[in-house]
Amino acid sequence: MTKREIIYQVLEKLNIHSDDSKLSEELVSSLIDTKRALLLKQQYATKGWHMPSEVKQELSIAVELIDRVAGYADAGKVLATSISLPESIKIKGKEGPLLVRKTDNTEIPLTLVAIERVPYLFENKYTQHLTYCAVDHDGKLYLMSKDNKLRFLKSIRVTDIYEQPDVARQYESSIDLSLEVWDDNYPMEASMVDTVVELVTKDLARTLSLPADNVNDASDGRG
C-alpha cells in the first residue's frame, strides 16, 4: 500500500477533504511515520533482528577511506559512509544496521561495537581479525578491519528500518524514479495499516477538536 492511500484513509475517517486548509497531508504523513515506528518498537521489542522484509529499506551509500574517527588514527583502515545515515528505529537488541552488503550483494560479516571502543579494537590478538562496524553520534557508519580488506569499496548497501521512510527512500538501491515518494510502496506490514490509521485518526480528532460523530468508525464499512 502507498502512503498516499493511507493518508486518504485517515482523511476519509475524519470527513476532511484533502484540500481542507485545517489539516495538511504533510502532518498526516508525519504522524503515520510516528505511529509506524511506535508499533514496530512494541511488536518487535524482544526480537529486533526478526523484522519482516516489508518494513525494511536497503540503501546504497557511498563510502570513503579516512584517517581518523573519534580519536582513532590508523591511515587507510577506516571506511566511512560519505553521509550520515537516516535515523533508524531504535529497538532493543538491534543496536545497528540489520545488514551491510557489498554492491555485488555479498554480505559483509560485521561485529557491531560502540563508537567509544574504536581505539581499542585491535589490541586483542584473538579478535583482531574481525571486521568491525560502528555508528557515531551523527549517524555516520564506519567499517574497520586490521588487514584493510575493504579499502577498495566505493559504496555499500545498508539495510535497516528507518524512522522516516520518505527520507531514506532517496538513497534506496532500487527505486522507481517515475513515482512520487507517496505513490511508492510504503514499508509497513499490511496487517498494521488499520491500526496506524486508527491511531492517527484519534490523534488528529483530538487536535482538531472534532465531535465524536464526525469521525467515521471502522465498523461503518469504509475503514
Question: What spans do the regions from the language model cover?
Answer:
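Glycine-enriched, solvent-exposed interface loops adjoining structured elements
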Residues: 1-223
